[in-house]
């Protein structure tokens, strides 16, 4: 059964259908930290605790009254920190997925390139095999021709076939040896016989033509073999170049595999982090999940019409909530944190009161705080505080009026308001409007400013007089100390003589009189200073200087006098000791 939730003095209430004249009254006390909800029956009655089940007649209920039971609502709360971390992990996963897609595309391109290179290498290998077969055949033909030529030229020593130039050369050598060498007649005859045999062989022209034909054939075969070898070398160079490219592509493919594995590992870590964060978020929503069966049970009891059980159940839940609220501070803080968004939706403060409409509700804009602002003087602060009191009274009156208007407006338009946007409120100071001030207030302000100025002038004058009196007292004290020092020096000089004349006694009396005058002057200066301080009582200042109080330092002249007195005593005692030692030494001799 769906029902519209409306506002009634800070509570969430479900109105019964077809009851336009129904008015729900909440408690007058402000419920600051509890969101409440009600349950209704299928007949449209809002239960509050005294009605009987749904089979009642009009005689039992002469006056139809709605009964409301309020349950503590545990709204769902998403921790912004956890939500930000989950969003960040989701962005990381998206980035890793994009990187994985890029790496996969690069791997596919590398694999396609390797396949194309393998295809080129396969065609070149088949060509190289064909060229190798041709070379083998040419070599076999060349060897056969070479063998036939060899058989033709030198089968035996008697059947040698020489050309005409070779025979002429041999004849020339033989004649030269005969003319210049030491060869006998028998050897000469043998050489002549050999030459004659050769002359007989030269006459065979068929063998010479066959020889020339075989030589030409061998030369042509050699040229063809060289061309085939060059083509085979070019093909092998291309195959080696392609194999190098394949090796580089395979290395790149391995690098991409490692990179992809690293990306997948990081993505899995992000998935694990998201799982942990979601578990943490669900733990934070445990109260919301626990409240769901409570509300379900309450709706079931309301639908069945079991009012007394519903009343007992509502009171037990309220008692349980209040015990947790009173005993556990962490529970209170958690519930306040959960309820704050709902309060912002309903334009309520944390104490349950409706917000002031003049207050600007802005959470997204944060006011920048400047740390290096200068501190104004206390006197100016006093004057500004006095002058701002009158404006604050007027603004307070206007605030009260606007609050009353806002309360009436919210009560009248509670049924029509349906807040869906979640706003986070930050309270800022309202802007000061230009206010019309009466002449009497202006005169009062001017009079207060003049009084403040007079007070400040008197305080300055008092401080100057205190400083002058202190300086005069210090000066008189210094003069007195000087005179005392001079008198002590004169007394020391006169103490050396045993007898004193009457003139000297008169002089000492004058010195004592002068000392008494100096002392009286110093005392009178101090009394005058104290009287001046009593005439101008010191007003309270806002500048506090906490300084530790130590012993007051003695004047320098008194310290010097004490030192001189000590030196004189020590000098006399040391002189007496020296005289005694001198006498002892004389007696011992």
From Swiss-Prot:
Location in the cell: Cell membrane; Endoplasmic reticulum membrane
Membrane topology: Single-pass membrane protein
Transmembrane domains' residue ranges: 568-588
Superkingdom of the organism of origin: Eukaryota
Keyword Coiled coil: yes
Disordered: annotated span: 370-450, 485-534
Expression (tissue specificity): Expressed in seedlings and flowers.
Cross-referenced InterPro entries: PPI1-4
A Gene Ontology term for the protein's cellular component: endoplasmic reticulum membrane
Ranges of compositional bias, category Basic and acidic residues: 370-383, 395-408, 426-450, 504-534
Annotated function: May regulate plasma membrane ATPase activity.
PANTHER family named in the record: PROTON PUMP-INTERACTOR 2-RELATED, RNA-BINDING PROTEIN YLMH-RELATED
Name of this chain's protein: Proton pump-interactor 2
């Amino acid at each position: 059964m769906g029902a519209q939730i409306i506002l009634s003095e800070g509570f969430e209430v479900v109105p019964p259908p077809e009851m336009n004249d129904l008015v729900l009254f909440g408690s007058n006390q402000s419920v600051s930290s509890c969101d409440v909800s009600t349950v209704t029956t299928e007949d449209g009655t809002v239960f509050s605790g005294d009605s009987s089940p749904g089979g009642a007649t009009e005689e039992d209920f002469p006056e139809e009254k709605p009964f409301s039971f309020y349950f503590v609502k545990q709204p769902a709360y998403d921790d912004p920190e956890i939500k930000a971390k989950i969003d960040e992990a989701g962005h990381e996963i998206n980035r890793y997925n994009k990187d994985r897609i890029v790496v996969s595309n690069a791997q596919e391109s590398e694999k396609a390139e390797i396949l194309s290179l393998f295809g080129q290498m396969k065609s070149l290998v088949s060509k190289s095999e064909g060229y190798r077969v041709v070379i083998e055949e040419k070599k076999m033909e060349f060897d056969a021709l070479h063998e036939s030529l060899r058989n033709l030229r030198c089968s035996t020593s008697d059947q040698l076939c020489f050309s005409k130039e070779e025979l002429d050369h041999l004849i020339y050598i033989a004649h030269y040896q005969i003319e210049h060498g030491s060869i006998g007649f028998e050897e000469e005859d043998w050489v002549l016989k050999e030459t004659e045999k050769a002359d007989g062989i030269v006459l065979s022209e068929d063998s010479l033509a066959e020889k020339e034909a075989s030589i030409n054939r061998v030369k042509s075969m050699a040229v063809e073999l060289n061309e085939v070898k060059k083509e085979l070398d070019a093909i092998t160079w291309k195959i080696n170049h392609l194999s190098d490219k394949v090796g580089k592509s395979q290395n790149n493919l391995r690098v991409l595999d490692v990179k992809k594995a690293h990306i997948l590992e990081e993505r899995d870590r992000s998935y694990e982090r998201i799982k942990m964060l979601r578990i943490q978020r669900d733990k934070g929503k445990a109260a919301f999940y626990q409240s769901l069966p409570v509300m379900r049970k309450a709706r079931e009891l309301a639908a069945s019409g079991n009012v007394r059980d519903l009343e007992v159940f509502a009171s037990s839940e309220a008692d349980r909530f209040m015990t947790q609220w009173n005993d556990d501070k962490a529970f209170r803080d958690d519930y306040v944190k959960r309820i704050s968004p709902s309060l912002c939706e309903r334009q309520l403060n944390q104490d349950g009161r409706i917000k002031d409409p003049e207050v600007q509700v802005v959470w997204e804009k944060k006011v920048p705080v400047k740390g290096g602002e200068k501190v104004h003087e206390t006197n100016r602060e006093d004057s500004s505080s006095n002058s701002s009191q009158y404006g604050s009274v007027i603004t307070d009156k206007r605030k009260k009026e606007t609050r009353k208007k806002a309360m009436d407006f919210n009560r009248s338009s509670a049924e029509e308001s349906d807040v869906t946007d979640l706003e986070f409120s930050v309270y800022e100071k309202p802007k000061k409007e230009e206010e019309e001030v009466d002449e009497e207030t202006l005169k009062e302000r001017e009079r207060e400013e003049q009084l403040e100025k007079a007070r400040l002038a008197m305080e300055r004058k008092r401080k100057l007089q205190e400083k002058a009196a202190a300086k005069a007292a210090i000066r008189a004290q210094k003069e007195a100390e000087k005179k005392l020092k001079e008198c002590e020096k004169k007394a020391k000089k006169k103490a050396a003589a045993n007898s004193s004349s009457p003139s000297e006694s008169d002089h000492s009396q004058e010195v004592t009189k002068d000392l008494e005058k100096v002392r009286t002057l110093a005392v009178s200066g101090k009394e005058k200073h104290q009287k001046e301080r009593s005439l101008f009582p010191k007003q309270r200042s806002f500048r506090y200087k906490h300084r530790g109080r130590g012993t007051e330092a003695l004047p320098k002249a008194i310290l010097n006098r004490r030192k001189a007195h000590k030196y004189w005593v020590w000098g006399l005692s040391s002189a007496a000791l020296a005289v005694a030692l001198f006498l002892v030494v004389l007696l011992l001799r």
